[in-house]
Amino acid sequence: MERRRITSARRSYASETVVRGLGPSRQLGTMPRFSLSRMTPPLPARVDFSLAGALNAGFKETRASERAEMMELNDRFASYIEKVRFLEQQNKALAAELNQLRAKEPTKLADVYQAELRELRLRLDQLTANSARLEVERDNFAQDLGTLRQKLQDETNLRLEAENNLAAYRQEADEATLARVDLERKVESLEEEIQFLRKIYEEEVRELREQLAQQQVHVEMDVAKPDLTAALREIRTQYEAVATSNMQETEEWYRSKFADLTDAASRNAELLRQAKHEANDYRRQLQALTCDLESLRGTNESLERQMREQEERHARESASYQEALARLEEEGQSLKEEMARHLQEYQDLLNVKLALDIEIATYRKLLEGEENRITIPVQTFSNLQIRETSLDTKSVSEGHLKRNIVVKTVEMRDGEVIKDSKQEHKDVVM
């Protein structure tokens, strides 16, 4: 490298004028692009050897300063080359990573998101269908429950009516029982009356017989004995006929009353038995309907509990799906932001690379110019054109870059600026 520096220093003599013409504000580290206008200096007709010593001294001084400047430039150039290589490697790595992200990850993530979204939508549709089915079943059960409640109300009304009828039948049975007891008491009183009348009749008959016997004895004693046997027989026959007719009438009246009371009691007993049978049937039906109602209430409570659980589970799953969707959207947004950041970094690296390429090209032009002017004698430059190029880079879609290029040209003569022009190229796609 030292040998290269010395050789480069020996080859060029006019670089001092170039560097001095740039001035302290135009250091080469700012990387402007220089273009030197072609000059044709006038050749002297004679060579004045009296100036050789002064020229040799100036030449040595110039060569020393040129060597120092060239060594510094070579060091800076080497460091820039290494930096460019490092940045190119990083650029390649980032470009490969960016291409990989563009080629694979978005598609894979999009497929994953689409699959998860399809699955979540499918599960949401299933849950919606299940919820609708459960609502229909709930409505059906509610309708069945209303029907059963109406039936229960009807059966309750029938039971109340049967209980009212049973109470009426019981009252009638009680009245019939009271009537039967009254009739039995009347029958007993009539039997007692018959017995009393019979005793009275027998007593009267006995007294009459005694009277007849006394009259017969008295008659036999006083007068002649009349024919009283026939009269007595007739009287006895009359009394026996009257007593027999009274007994028959009393027995017939008793039998008719007893038959009527027996028929009424049997009818009332049959009605009571039917009422008891109907009450037992109603009681069994009421028990069965009560059991059915309790079973339906339990089924309704179970279905309502299942429906609430389904609604709560549906709400939880919907909330989890919404959270998953929000999380996926956040991840997608973060990935987009990360990709945008990578693109921005890649753009910044491209800008740095472009600036370094411009700087390298500037150094290459300088070195080539120095090597091409190795055979030109020492002269002063009367004209110097300085061209500066600035870039404003914009990123466009689909991986292309759009830049604004500004070219500034400064023409100098004898250290004075005689022309300053500026040209701008907008939206140049690269």
Swiss-Prot record:
Residues 66-374 form the IF rod domain. One of its GO terms (molecular function) is integrin binding. GO terms for biological process: astrocyte development; Bergmann glial cell differentiation; D-aspartate import across plasma membrane; extracellular matrix organization; gene expression; intermediate filament organization; intermediate filament-based process; intracellular protein transport. The modification Citrulline is found at residues 33, 267, 403, 413. Residues 254-374 are annotated as: Coil 2B. It comes from the Eukaryota. InterPro entries: IF_conserved (IPR018039), IF_rod_dom (IPR039008), Intermed_filament_DNA-bd (IPR006821), Intermediate_filament (IPR050405). Residues 70-101 are annotated as: Coil 1A. The modification Phosphothreonine is found at residues 7, 40, 107, 147, 380. It holds the Pfam family Filament_head. Brain; isoform 2 expressed at 20-fold lower level than isoform 1. Residues 250-253 are annotated as: Linker 2. Residues 375-430 are annotated as: Tail. The modification Phosphoserine is found at residues 12, 35, 79, 266, 320, 382. Residues 113-211 are annotated as: Coil 1B. Belongs to the intermediate filament family. Interacts with SYNM. This is Glial fibrillary acidic protein. It comes from Mus musculus.
